[in-house]
Regions:
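A beta-strand/beta-hairpin structural motif
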Residues: 16, 66-70, 78-94
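Extended low-complexity, serine/threonine- and proline-enriched intrinsically disordered segments
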Residues: 47-62, 70, 124-130
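Beta-strand-rich interaction surfaces with strong enrichment in secreted/lumenal proteins
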Residues: 5-9, 19-22, 76-79, 93-98
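Start-of-domain marker
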Residues: 1-52, 57
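Internal, hydrophobic beta-strand segments that form the core of beta-sheet-rich folds
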Residues: 99-116, 120-130
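Solvent-exposed serine/threonine-rich low-complexity stretches and specific carbohydrate-binding patches
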Residues: 5-6, 64-72
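Exposed beta-strand and adjacent loop surfaces of beta-rich binding modules
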Residues: 29-31, 46-50, 65, 104, ...
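Extracellular and analogous surface-interaction loops
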Residues: 18-28, 94-100, 129-133
Length: 134
C-alpha cells in the first residue's frame, strides 16, 4: 500500500491525493484496491471517490467514480479497528494495465461527498498486486 494522509481539519474537495508509481513496478496487469483509514466519528456509511489514473497511456487519464461502503447495513464497521481508528481495503479494479514507457504513472483521488471539508477520514491508499493466476 501507498497511503496519503488527509489534513486533520478535513479533506477539502480541492485537495487531490496523488500517488506516483515507482519505475521499478514491472509492466503488466494488476489488481487494485483502495485502502481507507477512518475515524469512528466518520458520519456516513459510505464514501464517494473519483479515482483517475494514467497507467496505460501517460497522456490520458481514465476516471472512475466509486461508492465504497465503510459500514454494512447492520451498522458494523468494515475492516479492522483499534482505539477509534479503522482501516479497510476495498476492491477498485480486477485488472488495470500498467505500462513502463513514458513519463510518471500516477493515480489521483478526490472525494465527491457533499461535505466540504469532509471530516473523519485519516488516510487514503492504493494497493496494486499481480493477480494470483499470473
Amino acid at each position: 500500500h501507498s497511503y496519503a494522509p488527509v489534513p486533520l481539519d478535513g479533506w477539502d474537495k480541492s485537495d487531490t491525493l496523488v500517488y506516483t508509481l515507482p519505475n521499478s513496478i514491472p509492466a503488466g496487469n494488476y489488481e487494485a484496491e483502495i485502502g481507507i483509514r477512518y475515524q469512528e466519528s466518520y458520519p456516513y456509511r459510505d464514501i464517494w471517490l473519483e479515482v483517475s489514473h494514467n497507467t496505460k497511456d501517460t497522456l490520458t487519464y481514465v476516471t472512475d467514480t466509486l461508492q465504497l461502503f465503510l459500514v454494512d447495513e447492520a451498522g458494523n464497521k468494515t475492516g479492522n479497528g483499534l482505539c477509534g481508528l479503522y482501516q479497510c481495503d476495498l476492491p477498485y479494479k480486477a485488472s488495470i494495465p500498467i505500462r513502463t514507457e513514458g513519463s510518471a504513472r500516477t493515480f489521483r483521488i478526490v472525494h465527491i461527498m457533499t461535505d466540504n471539508p469532509l471530516t473523519g477520514i485519516s488516510d487514503i491508499g492504493i494497493r496494486l498486486r499481480k493477480p494470483e493466476n499470473q
